[in-house]
């Protein structure tokens, strides 16, 4: 069994008995092989995956003898790799072409990959392309290239992240009143699905921050303060800034009685607000 493009080990006949005056071979050797005086050598240039039976004849003045041998020529094993071997993709974004690089003259007859690629990605003759539709943590895949010379493999790793989130708060400058329930403040969210939310520093007493939503009734006054809000997912983080001011309650006053009649040069009683 030989390999295309690889020099074979020279085959010499073992001759006993009389001197051979003439040699013959049938059928003719494959392209790249030479048969001279019973010696077979060379570098096969074509594949022959089905064995061919050759008959070699040795002729002497006393007669002819023959010997048969079978020759198979396989394709060189295909050696390849992927550069890069690690890909970090984003759900919903196109991967145009991720193809192998090979290092020898072998040519693959078939390809396979294990396990199956995530939804949206396509594996075609060793090339990976498409638009992933699901998220995936880092996962290893084995790619196989097969031909008559055997199989070779390469490992690759694929991570698929959620698209980075985008968000906005409107209004972003809140003026609240102590002991007065605020209007719920919800962010406008686009991009990927948000996994976690954060806010710094802690919001004023009486307010709550849940899944990006600020609500509640502030219990104490405070000067204008800036807060940083993060929206996070596997694709990254988005930052927004808001300001919160908490004012004191507007006082309410009244006088009883509403009307007072005074006398000139006469001391009045204190008239105090209620």
Where are the predicted features?
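A short beta-strand segment in extracellular, disulfide-stabilized domains
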Residues: 7-15, 94-102, 181-189, 267-274
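Exposed beta-strand face motif in extracellular beta-rich ectodomains
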Residues: 50-54, 137-141, 223-227
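Short, solvent-exposed loop/linker segments at the N-terminal edge
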Residues: 1-7, 88-94, 174-181, 260-267
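Low-complexity "stalk/linker" and mucin-like segments enriched in Ser/Thr/Pro/Ala/Gly
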Residues: 24-39, 113-126, 198-213
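Extracellular/luminal low-complexity segments enriched in Ser/Thr/Pro
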Residues: 39-49, 127-136, 213-221
């Amino acid at each position: 069994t030989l390999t295309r493009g690889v020099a074979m080990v020279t085959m010499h006949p073992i001759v006993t008995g009389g001197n051979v005056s003439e040699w013959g071979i049938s059928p003719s050797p494959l392209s790249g092989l030479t048969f001279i005086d019973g010696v077979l050598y060379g570098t096969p240039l074509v594949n022959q995956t089905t064995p061919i039976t050759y008959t070699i004849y040795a002729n002497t003045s006393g007669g002819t003898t023959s010997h048969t041998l079978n020759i198979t020529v396989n394709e060189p094993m295909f050696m390849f790799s992927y550069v890069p071997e690690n890909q970090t993709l984003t759900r919903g974004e196109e991967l145009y072409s991720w193809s192998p690089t090979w290092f020898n003259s072998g040519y693959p007859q078939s390809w396979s990959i294990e396990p199956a690629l995530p939804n949206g990605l396509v594996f075609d003759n060793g090339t990976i392309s498409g638009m992933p539709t699901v998220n995936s943590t880092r996962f290893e895949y084995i790619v196989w290239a097969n031909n008559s010379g055997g199989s070779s493999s390469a490992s690759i790793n694929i991570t698929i992240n959620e698209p980075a989130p985008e968000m906005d708060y409107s209004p972003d400058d809140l003026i609240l009143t102590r002991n007065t329930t605020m209007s719920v403040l919800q962010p406008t969210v686009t991009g990927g699905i948000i996994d976690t939310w954060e806010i710094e520093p802690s919001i004023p007493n009486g307010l709550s921050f849940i899944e990006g939503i600020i609500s509640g009734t502030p219990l104490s006054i405070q000067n204008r303060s800036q807060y940083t809000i993060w929206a996070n997912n596997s694709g990254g983080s988005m930052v927004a800034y808001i300001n919160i001011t908490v004012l004191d309650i507007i006082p309410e006053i009244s006088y009883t009685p509403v009307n007072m009649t005074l006398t000139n040069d006469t001391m009045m009683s204190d008239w105090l607000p209620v």
